[in-house]
Amino acid sequence: MTDSDSGTAAEIEITADLVRDLLREQHPDLAELAVREVAGGWDNQQWRLGDELAVRMPRTERAPELQRKECRWLPHLAPRLPLPVPRPVRVGEPSARFPKRWTIMTWVPGEPLDRTSISRGDHAADTLADFLGALHVAAPAEAPGVVDRGAHPGTYTEGFDHFFRSVALDGRADEVRAVWDDAVAAPAWEDRPVWVHGDLHPANVVVSGGTLSGVIDFGDLFAGDPAWDLAAAWVVLPRGGAARFFDAYAHADGAAIRRARGLAALKSLFLMLMGQNGDRGLPGGKPAWGPAGRAALDRVLSTDGR
């Protein structure tokens, strides 16, 4: 996605000097902390601020709204979650120097999983189960609802088909299709909507000491079907982790596991496509995501559902 209006954030080069100038204008007490760019996500460019903070600068049209969502709900969710998550500290308002809202968040220590690996698989499975068990509670009526993700897998067949056609599946296409078709055939979530992170994949979890140590990027947070997060049993955890995860999580019935496994296949194909785009030098491509996606898909296909 790109901005099309003159003077929008996407057309402004975000540099360390700009970040520091904005801090001097709006948060001068933080302006002398060290500033360095670190890996960001789809929607935000990220700058480390000192040792404990991060500045998130929007680079897509939807990013400011996602930041508002995080600022609204993370203070409510974070205190009861068993892993560190970003917490909003300050807000930067639109100005002549930068036309969009930006935020200062706490920094979650650790290395993103797309740049490292989990060596303590059982511990990571238990940790993820504890985290999602704490997150997946009934959400209030005013919680953000389903937008571009969160509905039943059958709603996303067009997207699945696009990813499916775009990557090489090395003779496993029929297996992948069967997993997806089973998810589409699974009964829908009919309980009360629960809080769902919505975007759990290797770039949005961090690792320390060989296990999960934090979860980041809650911009896609919504209230809905927890299967969207349960897919992380295959997308995030190493081989063998899914069975232990579901035993520890203990709240997923067979239909939820079927939906989650199909969504894990969908997410794996997406990671593979983004890796492929990165290898080809295309905009938005992420070379490190290709191997992560292929490994995740192998885990999806190497299990009978658990």
Regions from the PLM with identified roles:
Residues 7, 32-155, 165-171, 175:
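ATP-binding pocket architecture of kinase catalytic cores
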Residues 220, 232-306:
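Helix-rich C-terminal or lid/interface subdomains of diverse kinases
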Residues 62-65, 193-196, 201-261:
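Active-site Asp-x-Gly
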Residues 116, 163-194:
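ATP-dependent phospho-/nucleotidyl transfer catalytic cores
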Residues 23, 46, 55, 74, ...:
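Generic structural signal for small/hydrophobic residues in well-ordered secondary structure
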Residues 1-28:
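Juxta-kinase regulatory segment immediately upstream of eukaryotic protein kinase catalytic domains
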Residues 50, 100, 191-193, 211:
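Conserved catalytic motifs of the protein kinase core domain
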